[in-house]
């Protein structure tokens, strides 16, 4: 199994309640039911007020590297990425477990 983690940081001046952000969140929340290769899927807003914290997180799992590739290339995932690219940056980590 491969764990796929993503941490998002909203760009300066961007708020969680902006329509484009809400659309991005909904697009990612829906992925768990849209992409068959996902074995585990959760995403949520950060609840910590620590200055080093990121704003939004995705925690997911797939069977193997091929499944991860299919997930990353899936049109629904690509559509969500296109939305988030407009208002955030992110870091990722993928590891076997």
From Swiss-Prot:
PROSITE patterns for the chain: S_R_A_B_BARREL
Superkingdom, natural source: Bacteria
InterPro entries, sorted: Dabb, Dimeric_a/b-barrel
Stress-response A/B barrel domain span: 2-95
Any one Pfam family match given in the protein's UniProt record, by short name: Dabb
PANTHER family (UniProt xref): BLL2683 PROTEIN (PTHR37832), STRESS-RESPONSE A_B BARREL DOMAIN-CONTAINING PROTEIN (PTHR37832:SF1)
Name of the protein in its database record: Uncharacterized protein SCO4036
Species of the source: Streptomyces coelicolor (strain ATCC BAA-471 / A3(2) / M145)
Classification lineage: Bacteria, Bacillati, Actinomycetota, Actinomycetes, Kitasatosporales
